[in-house]
Amino acid sequence: MAKKETKHTPLTKLKFQDPIFGISFHPEQPRFVVGSSTGTVTAYKYSVDPQSATCGAPEVVWTTKRHKGSCRALIYSEDGSSVYSVGSDGVIKRADSQSGKVRAKNTESLPSTPSCIVRSEAYVAVGCEDGSIVAFDKTSLAEKHRAEGAHDGECVNALLELTHQNKHSFASLGSTTACVVDVRKGVKSTSDDQEDEILCGTMAAKDMGVCGMSQGQITTWTLGFNDQQNRVKLSEESIDAVIGAEDDYEVYAGGGEGIVWLANVKSGKKLDQFVHSRNDEVSFLDLDYQYRLVTASMNSLKLWPTADDEQKQAEVAAAKGAEEEQKAAPSGPPRKKHKKVKNKAHNPGVAHFGDL
């Protein structure tokens, strides 16, 4: 257990009418996009006050019916100028992130329903439900390479870029195995059977991958992804989303309990926790451009404060409390109390006229 259970309050939250299947936050601006079960993609903006660390409700920038069926996944480009999305219609599109206008699309290359999308130095790569991985040109969306047969034809749940090997390599996670794939040559290696479904993954550092498992654990992997090296038990329910934190070897992980844990995968310790919901699972995690944690279920999204944000909030609250206390105090200087003059006592050394 974490040493201390800290209660955090989200900066802002958003509820959705239709179930969401994907979120992505802009790498340089306070913006994000959401893809829904109806095929709609919506872009939002928000503003966090730099002095008080408060945030109002997100505002819609644009919304459009982007895919027939559902939008299965989406992601910003490296500089945030484009948004890539894939749908159950088998189409991948690149749109201008400011206007939402489509700049390129490919309607023919996906062999089955897409399940995930990742951006790398060289490609936009899409994992599919039949174990295929298709790499696209980032500008034209022309198909560049295709690898098939990962996970014995089972669904690709997550893709991780492995740029330390070369720009063509990815780790594919799905079913009960992890595969290293060169999109030019196909599957290079497959891990031992984990006897537990691998649902998600992230890179915790340049030399370590982390996977979320269906039995409530996160597992650590070396770069060869041959077998897990260590495991950390977080929950009695599945870990459906995991993302690297700002510091190496630290990750955020959440799932069926509706709780997100910050954990150090080297020490195996829980460092902090964020309660997204007591009723809904955590399906998606992201970080905004200032490394604020984002948690989302299929019907709600929350943006959480950083430690610096919480420090600013505490300072503002303390200053406000002092101001209110001062207002409640009586105005003006305190009145001085006048002493009553007592009758002087008879002085036996002086004669009274009546005695003369």
Curated annotation (Swiss-Prot):
One of its GO terms (cellular component) is nucleolus. It is found in: Nucleus, Nucleolus. WD repeats lie at residues 15-54, 66-105, 107-146, 193-231, 234-275, 277-314. Residues 334-345 have a biased composition (Basic residues). It comes from the Eukaryota. Its main location: nucleus. Residues 312-356 are annotated as: Disordered. Keywords: Nucleus, Repeat, WD repeat. PANTHER family: WD REPEAT-CONTAINING PROTEIN 55. Belongs to the WD repeat WDR55 family. This is WD repeat-containing protein JIP5. The gene is JIP5.
